[in-house]
């Protein structure tokens, strides 16, 4: 569960390293975001000479959360960190690679390119 002011690790090669959530997109009164939700975030750390710069406002999709999530078949899944992937307004990735595992629920939310680029999907 990600809320405003939460820090997230970036798992693609767009140039950003850390994000801070500003707003959760979707509904008017949404307080928390889970895997597959789109957020608006500010870049807190970045790599020099890359497309995404520090203090830039970007959109991101959450791919991993520390909060455990129960699936319909009874399996509980939890990751070690909160992580996101930077996207543009159309929903396309800004980077070309995704590092680390991602949640399988991204298929259901039509982020199939993120799942196909990731090395593992749990």
Swiss-Prot record:
GO biological process, one term: translation
Gene Ontology cellular-component terms listed: chloroplast; cytosolic large ribosomal subunit
Stretches that traverse the bilayer: none
Record keywords: Chloroplast, Plastid, Ribonucleoprotein, Ribosomal protein, RNA-binding, rRNA-binding
Cellular compartment(s): Plastid, Chloroplast
Entries under PROSITE patterns matching the protein: RIBOSOMAL_L14
A GO molecular-function annotation: structural constituent of ribosome
Pfam families reported in the protein's UniProt record: Ribosomal_L14 (PF00238)
InterPro entries assigned to the protein according to its UniProt record, in alphabetical order: Ribosomal_uL14, Ribosomal_uL14_bac-type, Ribosomal_uL14_CS, Ribosomal_uL14_sf
Family per record: Belongs to the universal ribosomal protein uL14 family.
Oligomer and partners: Part of the 50S ribosomal subunit.
General function of this protein: Binds to 23S rRNA.
UniProt name for this protein: Large ribosomal subunit protein uL14c
Origin species: Psilotum nudum (Whisk fern)
Origin organism lineage: Eukaryota, Viridiplantae, Streptophyta, Embryophyta, Tracheophyta
């Amino acid at each position: 569960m990600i809320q405003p002011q939460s820090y997230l690790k970036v798992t693609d090669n767009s140039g950003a390293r850390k994000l801070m959530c500003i707003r959760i997109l979707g509904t008017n009164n949404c307080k928390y975001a889970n895997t597959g939700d789109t957020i608006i975030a500010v870049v807190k750390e970045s790599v020099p000479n890359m497309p995404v710069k520090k203090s830039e406002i970007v959109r991101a999709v959450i791919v991993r959360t520390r909060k455990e999530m129960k699936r319909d078949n009874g399996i509980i899944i939890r990751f070690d960190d909160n992580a996101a992937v930077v996207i543009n307004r159309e929903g396309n990735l800004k980077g070309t690679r995704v590092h680390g595992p991602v949640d399988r629920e991204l298929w259901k939310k039509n982020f199939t390119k993120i799942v196909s680029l990731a090395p593992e999907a749990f």
